[in-house]
Amino acid sequence: MTNIRKTHPLAKIINNSFIDLPTPSNISAWWNFGSLLGICLILQILTGLFLAMHYTSDTTTAFSSVTHICRDVNYGWIIRYMHANGASMFFICLYMHVGRGLYYGSYTFTETWNIGIILLFTVMATAFMGYVLPWGQMSFWGATVITNLLSAIPYIGTDLVQWIWGGFSVDKATLTRFFAFHFILPFVVSALAAVHLLFLHETGSNNPSGIPSNSDKIPFHPYYTIKDILGALFLILTLMLLVLFSPDLLGDPDNYIPANPLSTPPHIKPEWYFLFAYAILRSIPNKLGGVLALVLSILILAIIPLLHTSKQRGMMFRPISQCLFWLLVADLLTLTWIGGQPVEHPYITIGQLASILYFTILLVLMPITSIIENNILKW
Protein backbone atom coordinates (compact mmCIF):
# COMPACT_ATOMS: atom_id res chain seq x y z
CA MET A 1 0.00 0.00 0.00
CA THR A 2 1.38 3.42 -1.00
CA ASN A 3 1.95 5.93 1.76
CA ILE A 4 -1.03 8.34 2.19
CA ARG A 5 1.27 11.37 1.89
CA LYS A 6 2.04 10.33 -1.69
CA THR A 7 -1.57 9.72 -2.75
CA HIS A 8 -3.82 12.16 -0.85
CA PRO A 9 -4.38 15.28 -3.04
CA LEU A 10 -3.48 17.76 -0.27
CA ALA A 11 -0.78 15.70 1.43
CA LYS A 12 0.82 15.11 -1.98
CA ILE A 13 1.39 18.86 -2.49
CA ILE A 14 2.99 19.19 0.97
CA ASN A 15 5.02 16.02 0.39
CA ASN A 16 6.38 17.24 -2.96
CA SER A 17 7.19 20.67 -1.53
CA PHE A 18 8.67 19.92 1.90
CA ILE A 19 9.33 16.19 2.35
CA ASP A 20 10.36 14.28 -0.79
CA LEU A 21 11.56 17.42 -2.60
CA PRO A 22 14.91 16.66 -4.31
CA THR A 23 17.34 19.31 -3.02
CA PRO A 24 21.00 20.02 -3.90
CA SER A 25 23.25 18.39 -1.30
CA ASN A 26 25.54 21.41 -0.90
CA ILE A 27 23.24 24.38 -0.20
CA SER A 28 24.60 26.53 2.61
CA ALA A 29 22.99 28.48 5.46
CA TRP A 30 22.28 31.28 2.94
CA TRP A 31 19.45 29.08 1.66
CA ASN A 32 17.78 29.18 5.10
CA PHE A 33 16.30 32.64 4.63
CA GLY A 34 13.36 31.47 2.49
CA SER A 35 11.98 29.36 5.33
CA LEU A 36 12.83 32.11 7.84
CA LEU A 37 10.78 34.57 5.77
CA GLY A 38 7.87 32.10 5.90
CA ILE A 39 8.19 31.95 9.70
CA CYS A 40 8.37 35.77 9.89
CA LEU A 41 5.21 36.06 7.76
CA ILE A 42 3.27 33.59 9.93
CA LEU A 43 4.48 35.35 13.09
CA GLN A 44 3.48 38.78 11.73
CA ILE A 45 0.01 37.55 10.68
CA LEU A 46 -0.62 35.96 14.11
CA THR A 47 0.66 38.88 16.23
CA GLY A 48 -1.08 41.33 13.87
CA LEU A 49 -4.37 39.47 14.23
CA PHE A 50 -4.24 39.75 18.03
CA LEU A 51 -3.28 43.43 17.81
CA ALA A 52 -6.19 44.10 15.42
CA MET A 53 -8.59 42.71 18.04
CA HIS A 54 -7.74 45.64 20.34
CA TYR A 55 -6.71 48.38 17.91
CA THR A 56 -9.08 51.12 16.72
CA SER A 57 -8.38 52.82 13.38
CA ASP A 58 -9.69 56.24 14.31
CA THR A 59 -7.50 59.34 14.63
CA THR A 60 -8.92 60.21 18.05
CA THR A 61 -8.37 56.76 19.61
CA ALA A 62 -5.59 55.01 17.57
CA PHE A 63 -2.70 56.21 19.76
CA SER A 64 -4.64 55.49 22.96
CA SER A 65 -5.61 52.01 21.73
CA VAL A 66 -1.92 51.12 21.23
CA THR A 67 -1.17 52.40 24.74
CA HIS A 68 -4.12 50.34 26.02
CA ILE A 69 -2.70 47.21 24.30
CA CYS A 70 0.66 47.73 26.02
CA ARG A 71 -0.74 48.54 29.47
CA ASP A 72 -4.05 46.75 29.93
CA VAL A 73 -4.22 43.76 27.55
CA ASN A 74 -2.74 40.52 28.93
CA TYR A 75 0.71 40.18 27.34
CA GLY A 76 -0.27 42.97 24.94
CA TRP A 77 3.17 44.58 25.31
CA ILE A 78 4.97 41.45 24.10
CA ILE A 79 2.55 41.00 21.16
CA ARG A 80 3.03 44.64 20.13
CA TYR A 81 6.83 44.51 20.37
CA MET A 82 7.03 41.11 18.65
CA HIS A 83 5.05 42.62 15.78
CA ALA A 84 7.18 45.79 15.58
CA ASN A 85 10.53 43.99 15.88
CA GLY A 86 9.23 41.06 13.80
CA ALA A 87 9.03 43.54 10.91
CA SER A 88 12.72 44.36 11.41
CA MET A 89 13.63 40.66 11.42
CA PHE A 90 11.47 40.23 8.30
CA PHE A 91 13.48 42.87 6.44
CA ILE A 92 16.84 41.56 7.66
CA CYS A 93 15.87 38.14 6.25
CA LEU A 94 14.52 39.75 3.05
CA TYR A 95 17.72 41.67 2.34
CA MET A 96 19.86 38.60 3.13
CA HIS A 97 17.65 36.53 0.79
CA VAL A 98 17.95 39.06 -2.06
CA GLY A 99 21.71 39.39 -1.42
CA ARG A 100 22.06 35.61 -1.65
CA GLY A 101 20.18 35.68 -4.97
CA LEU A 102 22.53 38.35 -6.32
CA TYR A 103 25.71 36.64 -5.10
CA TYR A 104 24.92 33.14 -6.32
CA GLY A 105 23.15 34.11 -9.55
CA SER A 106 19.73 32.80 -8.49
CA TYR A 107 18.21 35.63 -10.58
CA THR A 108 18.64 33.42 -13.66
CA PHE A 109 15.37 31.77 -12.54
CA THR A 110 13.59 34.81 -13.96
CA GLU A 111 9.99 33.89 -13.00
CA THR A 112 10.95 33.16 -9.38
CA TRP A 113 13.10 36.32 -9.27
CA ASN A 114 10.37 38.61 -10.70
CA ILE A 115 7.72 37.26 -8.32
CA GLY A 116 10.29 37.90 -5.57
CA ILE A 117 10.59 41.56 -6.62
CA ILE A 118 6.78 41.93 -6.54
CA LEU A 119 6.84 40.31 -3.08
CA LEU A 120 9.51 42.79 -1.93
CA PHE A 121 7.41 45.77 -3.10
CA THR A 122 4.27 44.34 -1.44
CA VAL A 123 6.04 43.73 1.88
CA MET A 124 7.50 47.26 1.76
CA ALA A 125 4.02 48.73 1.15
CA THR A 126 2.60 46.65 4.01
CA ALA A 127 5.36 47.76 6.41
CA PHE A 128 4.94 51.42 5.44
CA MET A 129 1.19 51.34 6.12
CA GLY A 130 1.75 49.47 9.39
CA TYR A 131 4.10 52.23 10.57
CA VAL A 132 1.28 54.77 10.13
CA LEU A 133 -1.17 52.90 12.39
CA PRO A 134 0.12 53.82 15.90
CA TRP A 135 -0.60 57.46 14.89
CA GLY A 136 2.47 58.94 16.55
CA GLN A 137 4.36 61.95 15.19
CA MET A 138 6.59 59.89 12.89
CA SER A 139 3.57 57.86 11.72
CA PHE A 140 1.69 60.98 10.68
CA TRP A 141 4.60 62.90 9.14
CA GLY A 142 6.07 59.80 7.51
CA ALA A 143 2.70 59.13 5.86
CA THR A 144 2.42 62.78 4.78
CA VAL A 145 5.91 62.97 3.27
CA ILE A 146 5.91 59.58 1.51
CA THR A 147 2.38 59.80 0.06
CA ASN A 148 3.13 63.37 -1.03
CA LEU A 149 5.89 62.02 -3.30
CA LEU A 150 3.17 60.83 -5.68
CA SER A 151 2.34 64.48 -6.38
CA ALA A 152 5.55 64.51 -8.46
CA ILE A 153 3.74 62.44 -11.12
CA PRO A 154 2.95 64.87 -13.95
CA TYR A 155 -0.66 66.00 -14.53
CA ILE A 156 -2.45 63.49 -12.24
CA GLY A 157 -0.10 63.75 -9.22
CA THR A 158 -2.08 66.12 -6.96
CA ASP A 159 -5.41 64.41 -7.64
CA LEU A 160 -3.83 61.01 -7.00
CA VAL A 161 -2.44 62.10 -3.61
CA GLN A 162 -5.81 63.53 -2.52
CA TRP A 163 -7.54 60.34 -3.70
CA ILE A 164 -5.17 58.23 -1.57
CA TRP A 165 -5.59 60.55 1.42
CA GLY A 166 -9.38 60.61 1.10
CA GLY A 167 -9.26 64.36 1.71
CA PHE A 168 -6.90 67.34 1.62
CA SER A 169 -4.48 65.96 4.22
CA VAL A 170 -3.57 62.73 6.02
CA ASP A 171 -6.57 62.27 8.33
CA LYS A 172 -9.24 59.86 9.57
CA ALA A 173 -10.02 58.45 6.09
CA THR A 174 -6.32 57.80 5.43
CA LEU A 175 -5.81 55.94 8.71
CA THR A 176 -8.90 53.76 8.20
CA ARG A 177 -7.93 52.72 4.66
CA PHE A 178 -4.30 52.12 5.66
CA PHE A 179 -5.51 49.79 8.41
CA ALA A 180 -7.72 47.92 5.92
CA PHE A 181 -4.83 47.54 3.46
CA HIS A 182 -2.36 46.64 6.19
CA PHE A 183 -4.70 43.84 7.27
CA ILE A 184 -5.31 42.39 3.79
CA LEU A 185 -1.83 42.69 2.20
CA PRO A 186 -0.09 39.98 4.30
CA PHE A 187 -2.57 37.48 2.86
CA VAL A 188 -1.71 38.72 -0.64
CA VAL A 189 1.96 38.22 0.33
CA SER A 190 1.13 34.64 1.42
CA ALA A 191 -0.48 33.91 -1.96
CA LEU A 192 2.47 35.44 -3.83
CA ALA A 193 4.90 33.41 -1.70
CA ALA A 194 3.05 30.24 -2.77
CA VAL A 195 3.47 31.28 -6.44
CA HIS A 196 7.15 32.09 -5.71
CA LEU A 197 7.61 28.51 -4.41
CA LEU A 198 5.63 27.07 -7.33
CA PHE A 199 8.02 28.66 -9.84
CA LEU A 200 11.06 27.65 -7.76
CA HIS A 201 9.97 24.00 -7.71
CA GLU A 202 9.61 24.06 -11.51
CA THR A 203 13.38 24.51 -11.82
CA GLY A 204 14.69 23.25 -8.47
CA SER A 205 17.02 25.17 -6.18
CA ASN A 206 20.26 26.81 -7.20
CA ASN A 207 23.39 25.92 -5.18
CA PRO A 208 26.59 27.74 -4.11
CA SER A 209 28.71 26.38 -6.98
CA GLY A 210 26.17 27.44 -9.63
CA ILE A 211 26.66 24.08 -11.37
CA PRO A 212 23.55 21.95 -12.17
CA SER A 213 23.02 19.56 -9.25
CA ASN A 214 20.72 16.97 -10.87
CA SER A 215 23.32 14.25 -10.31
CA ASP A 216 23.53 14.94 -6.56
CA LYS A 217 20.18 15.54 -4.89
CA ILE A 218 18.98 14.56 -1.41
CA PRO A 219 15.44 14.57 0.08
CA PHE A 220 14.44 17.81 1.80
CA HIS A 221 13.29 15.91 4.90
CA PRO A 222 15.08 15.24 7.27
CA TYR A 223 18.26 16.96 6.02
CA TYR A 224 16.95 20.45 5.42
CA THR A 225 13.95 20.39 7.76
CA ILE A 226 16.36 20.03 10.69
CA LYS A 227 18.59 22.75 9.21
CA ASP A 228 15.59 25.08 8.85
CA ILE A 229 14.56 24.40 12.46
CA LEU A 230 18.05 25.43 13.61
CA GLY A 231 17.74 28.63 11.55
CA ALA A 232 14.30 29.27 13.06
CA LEU A 233 15.72 28.88 16.58
CA PHE A 234 18.38 31.51 15.83
CA LEU A 235 15.70 33.81 14.36
CA ILE A 236 13.39 33.47 17.38
CA LEU A 237 16.32 33.86 19.80
CA THR A 238 17.42 37.12 18.10
CA LEU A 239 13.84 38.41 17.95
CA MET A 240 13.15 37.65 21.62
CA LEU A 241 16.47 39.22 22.70
CA LEU A 242 15.33 42.39 20.90
CA VAL A 243 11.78 42.26 22.25
CA LEU A 244 12.69 41.52 25.87
CA PHE A 245 15.85 43.61 26.31
CA SER A 246 15.63 46.60 23.96
CA PRO A 247 12.24 46.67 22.21
CA ASP A 248 12.60 50.33 21.15
CA LEU A 249 16.16 50.02 19.84
CA LEU A 250 15.09 50.15 16.18
CA GLY A 251 12.09 52.46 16.62
CA ASP A 252 11.86 56.26 16.69
CA PRO A 253 11.25 58.02 20.04
CA ASP A 254 9.12 60.62 18.19
CA ASN A 255 6.48 57.95 17.67
CA TYR A 256 5.71 58.06 21.41
CA ILE A 257 4.36 61.59 20.85
CA PRO A 258 0.73 61.58 19.57
CA ALA A 259 0.34 62.83 15.97
CA ASN A 260 0.08 66.60 15.75
CA PRO A 261 -0.46 68.18 12.30
CA LEU A 262 0.61 71.58 13.73
CA SER A 263 4.07 70.45 14.89
CA THR A 264 6.64 69.03 12.47
CA PRO A 265 9.36 66.79 14.00
CA PRO A 266 12.93 68.10 13.45
CA HIS A 267 13.95 65.05 11.37
CA ILE A 268 11.32 63.09 9.47
CA LYS A 269 12.61 59.62 8.63
CA PRO A 270 11.09 56.18 7.95
CA GLU A 271 11.94 52.94 9.75
CA TRP A 272 15.60 51.81 9.44
CA TYR A 273 14.85 49.27 6.70
CA PHE A 274 13.76 52.02 4.26
CA LEU A 275 16.60 54.43 5.02
CA PHE A 276 18.82 53.35 2.08
CA ALA A 277 16.01 54.13 -0.40
CA TYR A 278 15.15 57.35 1.50
CA ALA A 279 18.80 58.45 1.22
CA ILE A 280 18.71 57.87 -2.57
CA LEU A 281 15.44 59.87 -2.76
CA ARG A 282 16.97 62.81 -0.85
CA SER A 283 20.19 62.78 -2.90
CA ILE A 284 18.43 64.19 -5.97
CA PRO A 285 17.36 67.87 -5.70
CA ASN A 286 14.52 67.42 -8.22
CA LYS A 287 11.30 65.94 -6.79
CA LEU A 288 10.32 63.76 -9.77
CA GLY A 289 13.94 62.66 -10.24
CA GLY A 290 14.12 61.65 -6.59
CA VAL A 291 10.91 59.62 -6.82
CA LEU A 292 12.16 57.85 -9.97
CA ALA A 293 15.50 57.06 -8.28
CA LEU A 294 13.61 55.74 -5.23
CA VAL A 295 11.52 53.34 -7.35
CA LEU A 296 14.50 52.36 -9.52
CA SER A 297 16.63 51.56 -6.45
CA ILE A 298 14.44 48.45 -6.01
CA LEU A 299 13.18 48.00 -9.59
CA ILE A 300 16.80 47.77 -10.79
CA LEU A 301 16.70 44.18 -9.50
CA ALA A 302 14.38 43.32 -12.41
CA ILE A 303 17.08 44.06 -15.01
CA ILE A 304 19.88 42.22 -13.17
CA PRO A 305 19.23 38.99 -15.20
CA LEU A 306 19.68 41.01 -18.43
CA LEU A 307 23.02 42.38 -17.20
CA HIS A 308 24.47 38.94 -16.45
CA THR A 309 27.48 38.74 -18.77
CA SER A 310 29.51 36.11 -16.91
CA LYS A 311 30.00 32.56 -18.18
CA GLN A 312 29.63 31.39 -14.58
CA ARG A 313 26.40 31.59 -12.65
CA GLY A 314 27.41 32.57 -9.13
CA MET A 315 30.30 34.59 -7.72
CA MET A 316 31.86 31.65 -5.86
CA PHE A 317 34.80 31.46 -8.30
CA ARG A 318 34.86 35.17 -9.30
CA PRO A 319 37.00 37.12 -6.78
CA ILE A 320 36.75 40.53 -8.53
CA SER A 321 32.93 40.30 -8.63
CA GLN A 322 32.99 39.27 -4.97
CA CYS A 323 34.88 42.47 -4.08
CA LEU A 324 32.28 44.50 -6.02
CA PHE A 325 29.42 42.70 -4.27
CA TRP A 326 30.80 43.50 -0.81
CA LEU A 327 31.46 47.07 -1.92
CA LEU A 328 27.74 47.21 -2.82
CA VAL A 329 26.84 45.90 0.66
CA ALA A 330 29.09 48.55 2.28
CA ASP A 331 27.51 51.19 0.04
CA LEU A 332 23.99 50.15 1.12
CA LEU A 333 25.05 50.33 4.79
CA THR A 334 26.45 53.83 4.12
CA LEU A 335 23.14 54.86 2.48
CA THR A 336 21.23 53.47 5.48
CA TRP A 337 23.38 55.58 7.81
CA ILE A 338 22.97 58.71 5.63
CA GLY A 339 19.18 58.25 5.47
CA GLY A 340 19.02 58.66 9.24
CA GLN A 341 21.14 61.85 9.28
CA PRO A 342 19.91 65.45 8.91
CA VAL A 343 20.11 67.10 5.46
CA GLU A 344 23.33 69.10 5.95
CA HIS A 345 27.00 69.07 4.96
CA PRO A 346 28.82 66.59 4.73
CA TYR A 347 25.90 64.12 4.72
CA ILE A 348 24.38 65.49 1.49
CA THR A 349 27.60 64.91 -0.49
CA ILE A 350 28.22 61.46 1.03
CA GLY A 351 24.62 60.49 0.19
CA GLN A 352 24.96 61.67 -3.41
CA LEU A 353 28.26 59.80 -3.90
CA ALA A 354 26.84 56.63 -2.32
CA SER A 355 23.73 56.85 -4.54
CA ILE A 356 25.83 57.24 -7.71
CA LEU A 357 28.05 54.34 -6.61
CA TYR A 358 25.01 52.10 -5.97
CA PHE A 359 23.70 52.44 -9.53
CA THR A 360 27.21 52.40 -11.05
CA ILE A 361 28.12 49.08 -9.38
CA LEU A 362 24.92 47.37 -10.52
CA LEU A 363 24.60 48.84 -14.02
CA VAL A 364 28.21 49.36 -15.13
CA LEU A 365 30.91 47.78 -12.96
CA MET A 366 29.41 44.32 -12.43
CA PRO A 367 28.71 43.55 -16.14
CA ILE A 368 32.17 44.88 -17.17
CA THR A 369 33.90 42.90 -14.40
CA SER A 370 32.13 39.73 -15.55
CA ILE A 371 33.45 40.23 -19.11
CA ILE A 372 36.99 40.80 -17.76
CA GLU A 373 36.71 37.60 -15.67
CA ASN A 374 35.53 35.66 -18.74
CA ASN A 375 38.68 36.80 -20.57
CA ILE A 376 40.93 35.95 -17.61
CA LEU A 377 39.60 32.37 -17.83
CA LYS A 378 40.99 32.09 -21.38
CA TRP A 379 44.58 32.80 -20.30
Swiss-Prot record:
Gene3D superfamilies: Cytochrome Bc1 Complex, Chain C. GO terms for molecular function: metal ion binding; ubiquinol-cytochrome-c reductase activity. One of its GO terms (cellular component) is respiratory chain complex III. Keywords: Electron transport, Heme, Iron, Membrane, Metal-binding, Mitochondrion, Mitochondrion inner membrane, Respiratory chain, Transmembrane, Transmembrane helix, Transport, Ubiquinone. InterPro entries: Cyt_b/b6_C (IPR005798), Cyt_b/b6_C_sf (IPR036150), Cyt_b/b6_N (IPR005797), Cytb/b6-like_sf (IPR027387), Cytochrome_b (IPR030689), Cytochrome_b_C_euk/bac (IPR048260), Cytochrome_b_N_euk/bac (IPR048259), Di-haem_cyt_TM (IPR016174). The chain crosses the membrane at residues 33-53, 77-98, 113-133, 178-198, 226-246, 288-308, 320-340, 347-367. Heme b b562 binds at residues 83, 182. Coiled coil: none annotated. It is a multi-pass membrane protein. It is found in: Mitochondrion inner membrane. Binds 2 heme b groups non-covalently. GO terms for biological process: mitochondrial electron transport, ubiquinol to cytochrome c. Heme b b566 binds at residues 97, 196. It comes from the Eukaryota. Its cofactor is heme b. A ubiquinone binds at residue 201. Component of the ubiquinol-cytochrome c reductase complex (complex III or cytochrome b-c1 complex) that is part of the mitochondrial respiratory chain. The b-c1 complex mediates electron transfer from ubiquinol to cytochrome c. Contributes to the generation of a proton gradient across the mitochondrial membrane that is then used for ATP synthesis. Belongs to the cytochrome b family. The cytochrome bc1 complex contains 11 subunits: 3 respiratory subunits (MT-CYB, CYC1 and UQCRFS1), 2 core proteins (UQCRC1 and UQCRC2) and 6 low-molecular weight proteins (UQCRH/QCR6, UQCRB/QCR7, UQCRQ/QCR8, UQCR10/QCR9, UQCR11/QCR10 and a cleavage product of UQCRFS1). This cytochrome bc1 complex then forms a dimer. This is Cytochrome b.
